[in-house]
Amino acid sequence: MEKNKKIDFSIGIFDDISENIKKRVKKEADNCEIYGVGVYSDEIVKNEYKTSPIRSEEERMNLVKNLEGVNFIFLVDSIDVNEIKKIVEKACKGVLKNRN
């Protein structure tokens, strides 16, 4: 990844985007140069959170991609920290490549 770029992200289910979520995302995005949002896959929500998402993962990704301050989105299909790190790094590389 490009040095000296502060990159931050949030991960969640994001079935509903409340005003509080919009404010939180904007605040977090304002404190970094590149901000991303990860959306848990339908499978992770069902198997790990023991619930069913209201919206499909595609619909949820469409909701978060238009939030103010979001530079990239990514699907999270693992709860393993090392796998999530790889997913985020891959998504960040795409954003950094497009910025240059």
How should these model regions be labeled?
Residues 1-100:
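Nucleotidyltransferase catalytic core that binds NTPs
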